[in-house]
Amino acid sequence: MALLHHTQNAAQIKLRYRISSSAKPASCQANSFGTPTGLHQIADCIGATAPAGMVFKGRRATGRLASEYPLNEQASNLITSRILRLRGLELAHNAGQGCDSFERYIYIHGTNHEDRIGQPFSGGCIEMFNFDIIALFEIAQLGDLVYIFN
């Protein structure tokens, strides 16, 4: 994933991040578990004061770090550290009935499986190293644009 600085005449890559996207093929369809493609915007920024590794359920901090969960729960893909919730901006592609990224709860977030970053592993979200999502969260703003390529 690359963070671009866009000017009127050009775009320049400012930062690069290794990520994990869906284990399934890219897809904007509801219930596909694929990472949606196309133009999105950041619709919500969640977890500003949470410590690295904090687990979120239903977009709320649980009060427990991933390492504090029983091993059987750690085996699942936990949402950790920060959440940037995405809203699709392309009607009938990633916005609207049957394909809406916001309604699918598509996020950019930290993970308890950092060893799998760089491999397709998620259930549709974009997962990052916890340190990286915290750094990205510090510079991201509501309304910032995100373009997801296949």
What are the residue ranges of the model-derived segments?
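Solvent-exposed coil/turn segments that connect beta secondary-structure elements
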Residues: 7-9, 22-24, 45-47, 87-89, ...
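Short beta-strand segments
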Residues: 13-17, 40, 104-106
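Exported/periplasmic cell-wall-interacting domains
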Residues: 50-150
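Short, well-structured hydrophobic secondary-structure segments
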Residues: 39-52
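A structural motif detector for short, solvent-exposed N-terminal "entry" segments of globular domains
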Residues: 1-25
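Short, flexible surface segments
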Residues: 36-37, 142
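Generic structural detector for well-ordered beta-strands
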Residues: 18-20, 41, 85
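N-terminal post-signal-peptidase region of extra-cytosolic proteins
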Residues: 16-32, 64-70, 130-131
